[in-house]
Amino acid sequence: LHQLDFSETLNYIEEIIAEGTSTLILYHGSNIAFDRIDLSKSHNRRDFGRGFYCTILEKQASEWAHRLYMRNLSGKEYVYQYVFHQSESLKIKHFYALDAEWLEFIKNNRIKGGIQHSYDVVIGPVADDNTMETVQLYMSGILKSSEAVERLRYNKVNNQVSFQLFL
């Protein structure tokens, strides 16, 4: 896997913002060819809710495309590139760490489904293979938030950017 320390990823994003650059290059991996974003194809119970998910890492998007292709054994592996123009009119939520707020946010979206927030864009860590066991133990009530955060502390995770504004 092509994983970075999440703080490295966020530092990269913050540097771009600090430089006054209002654009970010994002990638989306899929096994389906498309010309328009169709959120009816989005899965319901995802980390940041129903949305269109991208990443700043092209290799991560390529891995997403490969997993989808292997899971469905249909289509091809596609990696789409987008330019995201940040705007002050967008309500953007940044998660900077695998912390209690991130855990609770993911729990609400995964358990309740749909969109459990009012943000247009959410940026933060992915609950993936490295973190899923701890996240599941927290969601089931076996671990307290503080225990889960301590276990997640040393994990390296990928990033995700979820857009809900197409809904």
Region roles according to the model:
Residues F48-Y53:
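A short, exposed loop/beta-hairpin motif centered on an aromatic-Gly-Thr core
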Residues R36, A61-S62:
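Short, well-ordered alpha-helical microsegments
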Residues L1-L24, R46-D47, S62-E63, R67-L167:
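Conserved NAD+-utilizing ADP-ribose enzyme module
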Residues E19-R46:
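Short aromatic-glycine-(Arg/Gly/Cys) micro-motifs in beta-strand/loop hairpins
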